[in-house]
Every structure is written in C-alpha cells, then in structure tokens.
Amino acid sequence: MSYQAPIKDMLFVMQDLAGIGQLAALPGFEDYDLDTAQAVLEESARFCQDIVAPLNWEGDRNPSAFKDGQVTTTPGFQQAYRQFIEGGWQGVIHPTEYGGQGLPKLIATACTEMLHASSLSFALCPMLTDGA
C-alpha cells in the first residue's frame, strides 16, 4: 500500500477550522493564503509520496547496519535526504534570514505530518536536526 497525502483534508482544516484567511491578515503573513498553502502541500506530498514513502519497503529489506565501526544506511536514504535538504524542507518553518522558508506553523505542520506519515524512520533524522 502506498502513501497518499490527505491534501484535501488538510486544506479543509486550514480554511474552515484554523482560518488561514485570518492568518494571512497578520503582518508578515500576507503572502500565505489558501492558494499558497495548497501549492506547498502539493509539492510536499509529491516528495513524500514519490521519494520518501518507497523507502519503507527498502528499509525493511535492507535495514541500516553497524558493523566493524561502520554505519551502512538503507539504500536510497542518503539520496532522499539530499533531496530533502535541496528542496528546502528542513527549513520550512525557520526564518528566511537563516535560510529557511519562513512559512507559518500551520503550513509547516502539515508538511511535517506528511513526512512522518510517509516514513517515520526517515523523518526521525530531520526531526532531531530541527530540534537541535
């Protein structure tokens, strides 16, 4: 079974429950309306569905290992992490002056949820980095 991001549900929550329109009225968040949220979520979903989710199967077949002082990661994890960083997903919520995207937590949380749902084993590394 493959991962399908619940974008429609997330957008419903953002618009009808969280009031993203009110968020867009706040200083500094004028550019973050429902259309922006949808574009970000669709791109995050594409990355999570196409790149991250398939790592689950590969991780089951070829798990990371520590042998003779060397760590061997699951095939594909290193490449996926590189794409994660290059895509700017690590800094979704972080201020732009520090290299982040400066997105509101409302949008960033949905991106994080998709990452965790698509492969928790992959998502643990960025999660720890984000908390550092």
Residue spans for each PLM region:
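N-terminal glycine-rich flavin-associated loop
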Residues: 124-132
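Amphipathic, small/basic residue-rich leader segments at the start of a protein or domain
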Residues: 1-124
